[in-house]
Amino acid sequence: QQLTGALPEIVPELPHCKGGRHVSGIAALGIPTLRVTNGPVGLGQNDCVSASIPPIYFNLGGERVDITAYTDASSAKATALPSAMGAAASFDPAVAAAYGDVIGTEMLNLALHVFEAPGMNLSRLPILGRNFEYFGEDPYLAGVMSVAEIKAVQAKGLIGMAKHFVANEQETNRTTVQETVDRQVLRELYLLPFEMSVKDGKVASIMCA
């Protein structure tokens, strides 16, 4: 799943688990083991439990969704932090740094390497279902807070991930909608937090939208 187009002899080495966020190391290719967790308001639990565990399903709009990786008792526990928008309301990057410090500490305790956060999309829609993940509607503030969190996480030798690149400002049809944004607006608003994360935060990875 994580190595698209992987050679057949490599595929069996991928982890047999539910959640699928972890990538086993492949010594022959010099690839270390990477254990990935979701965010952004704390660790997304273990995200990977044994495939032998009976599935736990949730009915989501008529579709059965396997939520075993998030609900089974073997999934690691972590602190549920306040919303990112709440942290941004402080207008204080020290708050975001403290946020990242807690996350980084718990990642080390749980032997996790990659944090799929911070989220730096803008709260363009008041009813956006994921506004709690983002630092509000101001791109500069979002960038400042993201940089502080990234630095705190990566100071512990971990990998931060700026997401979702770019213009991922709505949930409805987000996997199929075509976003058309004026070039100036794109650069001044939607790209700014990502640019700051790369230039100022030296973020180690980026998640595409």
Regions found by a protein language model. Name each.
Residues 1-209:
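Glycoside hydrolase catalytic-domain context in secreted enzymes
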